[in-house]
Amino acid sequence: VRTADFDYQLPPELIASEPLPQRSASRMMVVHRDSGLIEHRHFSDFPSYLRPQDLVVLNDTRVVPARFFPDEGGREVLRLEAISPLRWRCMIKPGKKFRLHQQFHLGGATGTVSEVLENGERLIDFDQPVDEATYGHLALPHYMGRDDQPSDTERYQTVFAREEGSIAAPTAGLHFTPEVLDQLPHAFVTLHVGVGTFQPVKVENVTDHVMHSERYEVPQETASAVNAAGRVIAVGTTATRTLESVAQSNAGRVVAARGSTDIFIYPGYQFQVVGALLTNFHLPKSTLMMLVSALAGRDLILKAYAEAIAQRYRFYSYGDCMLIV
C-alpha cells in the first residue's frame, strides 16, 4: 500500500478556517459502501439515517490549552502531556533556546528543561503550577493559518466534552448540538487526541509508518451498549480507533478498558465493531485518509472527495462532514 495512493489536490480556499455560525448547519455527504451512491445532505439529516438498534458512539475528550508562549518572547511550548502539574512533556521551538537545564518563565512559574529526549521532545519541571487559564492557548491546526480567538474556546470543543486531555478536537463531534444528541441512542468513549493526528505519513510504504500512541478509556456501560447494539455508528476516527483497538485485544468484543493505543487502520483491515462512520474531510496522505479508505474503499473515497471539491464542501476541522454507511 503506497502513501501516494491517498493523495488529492485541495484548493486552499476550501479549508474552513472559521466555524459556521451554527454548529449543526454543516453539509453532510453520505457515501453508501454497497452501491457506491453519493448523496448531498445536511447534518440535520443525520438522525434519519439511523436504523432500529443502532448505537452512536462519541468521544467525550475535552481539548485543553496546550500552547504556551514564555515571557522571554520568541519561543513556543507545545505541551504534549502533563505528567504531573509540575512536570510536562513538550515540543518546543526553537530548540536551541531550550537546552538542558535552561530556564524560562510563564507568569509566576519558572520552568527548567530537565531532560532532552531522543526525539527532540523536552521534559520540563516547574517550581509551581502554571496559570493555564491566563497563559494557555488552544493549539489550532496549522492549516487554519491563524491563532486562537476567544470564540474558539467554545467552538473548538464538542458540547459533550468531559474528560480533559486532548491537544486537538475530535472534529466529527463538533457538529452535534444537545438537541440532536437527545434524539439519538448514544454512548461515550474517551480518546485523548495527540499532536500525531495531523502528521502526514512521510514514508513511501504505508506499512513502514510508525503510529503515534494515544490514551483511551471505555466505560462498562458503553461496552455493554456496544455489544448489545445492532450497528455501531462511530462519530470520528478517534472513537473508531478506540473501539477497534479494544475489540482487537478481546476476540472481537468490546470490554471496559483503559490504556494506550497505536492502532493503525488502513485498507485491508477488517472492522470488528464499527459499521458506519461520521467523519470530517481529512488531509491528503494522512492516516485518517487511510482509515476512511479502509472502511469505504480507496476508489470510492477519492471519488467522494473529488465530488466534495466540485461541490465546494468545506474541509478539515471546522468543515463539513461525511457519513459512510
Report residues per predicted region.
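Surface-exposed, charge/polar-rich loops and edge strands
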Residues: 1-325
